[in-house]
Amino acid sequence: MGVPTVLDRAVQQAVAQVLEPIYEPLFSRNSYGFRPNRSAHQAILALKQYCSEGYIWAVDIDLSKYFDTLNHELLMNIIRRDIHDETLLVTIKAFLKSGVMENGVVHATEAGSPQGGNLSPILANIYLNEFDKLLEERGHMFCRYADDIMIVVRSERAAERVMSSSKEFLEGTLKLKVNQEKSTVGPICGLKFLGFTLYGTSRNGEWKVGITIHPKSLKRFKDKVKSILRERSQWTVESTLSYFTAYIRGWLAYYGLADMKYILETISGWARRKLRARFWSQWKTPRNRFRKLMLITTDRPNLSLTVGACLRYARAHGPWHMSAFRPLQSILSNKYLESIGFPKILEMYQNSHVLLVNRRVREVRTVV
């Protein structure tokens, strides 16, 4: 990714502001990436609507190093159809040819659009708009977010044909490279798109389509939570929980659209276990553990017996097993963990989910 200078960024922004009002009316309604008043949420909701209408087979196209492989000559020819100001054309071409610096050495760029600048996203959309127009001419339903492309059809046979013709156009006409290993044809439910996936369920004989988080995205989330709450973290518990809450809030701002109440119930319980294991590990000695536990709930009847049971169990079990031990859970209860800052994940999700679904559904109706 390139990091332009302040002057370069200002020039790029000026050029982008000139191009945007010209190309926005020309872009497809099925293009959602790097465009005003459009979002990834709108894209996945549109895909859900297509699936509900019977478009249950998908052509998932992955482009290899898309931003690095844009053909400069072809891109400039596309732009010249609508832009006739020679100064502007020269500026755009200079941006494309500006090169990249590696270890203090500038290398010329013969292809691609430098990432990290203000101009690159709109140039990338201008380039792939050629593919969007082809799909629309052929009557295909699709969603594209930058170089993430999902085309939906009604049958496997149609999907195979679309994959073949799309690959021919992208590689032959646009001179891009389709990643054969990651591009696939299959039932739309289960395929990953922008971190989400669709699922189908039957209720009272009626087929319903929903949105949930893709397993790969969920794994990344769990790995991040694990790293935040790891037993031997050097942060204080207060700092850890403050950061954890902020991370959950930011994560839900995007993934809160998904149906995942049960998933988050499970993860909340798992995260609380991680925190209990961290407490037990950091307290280290039986004496310190006894003292810490006795201070948590001083008015609890038979507290010393409960703490004693914890210490006896710990002789043969490590922190992770201890975190599931009922007597320890009764002291380091959910209520206690929340009192020291553990986030109410399910409550945060429900608030975020309702807000996102209502807002994005209104936006999709407006856009479509």
Where would I find each of the regions flagged by the language model?
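Non-catalytic terminal/accessory segments
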Residues: 1-368
